[in-house]
Amino acid sequence: MFPIDSATGDYDAEMMQKFDALVADKGFPWKLREILPKVLRAGEMAGTLTKEGARLLDRSGCLQPGVPLCPPEGDAGTGMTATKSVEKRTGNVSAGTSVFAMIVLEKPLSAMHREIDMVTTPAGDPVAMVHCNNCTSDLNAWVGLFAEFAECFGIKADKNKLFSTLYQKAMEGDKDCGGMIACNYYSGEPVTGLEEGRPMFLRRPDSHLGLANFMRSHLYASLATLKIGLDILLKEEDVKIDSITGHGGLFKTKGVGQSILAAAMNAPISVMETAGEGGAWGIALLAAYRKDKKEGESLSDYLNPVSYTHLTLPTIA
């Protein structure tokens, strides 16, 4: 919503002053701080459900007012929590129709990069995020085409089975995808400076056309733009990462998305059993932390024993 100063746990005061100065000639009857909500860290009390809110959510009257609320989070905060990527030198990748990677930093970046967004963990620590508009949308469209083909022969393929079968088939493909290249841009992509998307599939005349290479090329494409942004962090900014955890729909088929991401990042990747639930799992943990945390217990300490025992799948490098 607005840059956070991790040292104070509040909005960046210097940037707020700059904003107010830039709009001073507009005659607005407010200062920016007056219209922004209060910043809350994970574990703090965010209020309770009102009678009006309870009626809005449940007209039957079963839902009662007074339910305590934790500070809300978007996909970024819930993704970090779901994968326990809230400590320095940890990170996570959320991959579905869009994809983003978030790395918890040890120190601020040395320069401004348009490909990188600065956010925070739910506890307020600085995080560098690479967000790409395009991930699996093009891939999903092709899987839909294969489902339509099967229906022509009277076969009603189970959606989950269809995805897992095609994803696993991709692992049989050549490492260079047999000379095939997929461009998965359904929409514009700020990371590469494109305002509109045009999905494309290209191959050389001597390419090895086959289902395995076709699927592998589209899985590679789903993470290719993410790699451009991550290379800025890893190579230009020399950001250090001890662990990366994947979650989201791309990782539902065991081992496949995990292997592709490991190749893209040149780093070991872990995936949790709750990979497909990502955000919902994360906000549930944040609510539990609000309810059950002990005095002085950090979010990271709370997540260690409570939430992740036996949940991490084997790591793939």
Model-derived features: positions:
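Active-site core segments that coordinate phosphate-bearing ligands/cofactors
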Residues: 2-33, 40-245, 250-311, 317
